[in-house]
Amino acid sequence: MKNKIKIRLKSFDHRSLDQATKEIVSAVKRTFANISGPIPLPRKIQRFTVNRSPHVHIKSREQYEIRTQKRLLVIDDPNPVVVDALSKVDLAAGVDVVIELESGE
């Protein structure tokens, strides 16, 4: 039976995302566990167009976009020491972390 922990990181700022991945990778490597990644996932770009003027000038518009960067880390065959090390990692406020436990048969 082979277990895996998949960690998905998501952020609007790529600098804070890279810093968070470095902290997680160093914490896992200190426990001598096998880690794959960081694997960069496709970025999601959301674009919004709004009118500058509420009435007359319909051709005058502003365009905004939000870029969401994503990374994936996979820890093969984790032990309780790895889970304890992951719980002690302090990450930046702008980074969203999703942790999935996958058990193989």
UniProtKB/Swiss-Prot annotation:
Pfam family, one: Ribosomal_S10
Keyword terms: Ribonucleoprotein, Ribosomal protein
Matches recorded under InterPro entries: Ribosomal_uS10, Ribosomal_uS10_dom, Ribosomal_uS10_dom_sf
GO molecular function: structural constituent of ribosome; tRNA binding
SUPFAM superfamilies on file: Ribosomal protein S10 (SSF54999)
Cellular-component GO terms for this entry: ribonucleoprotein complex; ribosome
Record field: transmembrane: none
The UniProt record lists the keyword Transport: no
One GO process term, biological-process aspect: translation
Keyword Ribosomal protein: yes
NCBIfam families named in the record: PRK00596.1, rpsJ_bact
Complexes and interactors: Part of the 30S ribosomal subunit.
PANTHER family for this protein: 30S RIBOSOMAL PROTEIN S10 FAMILY MEMBER
Function in brief: Involved in the binding of tRNA to the ribosomes.
Family: Belongs to the universal ribosomal protein uS10 family.
Protein name: Small ribosomal subunit protein uS10
Source species: Rickettsia bellii (strain OSU 85-389)
Taxonomic lineage of the native organism: Bacteria, Pseudomonadati, Pseudomonadota, Alphaproteobacteria, Rickettsiales
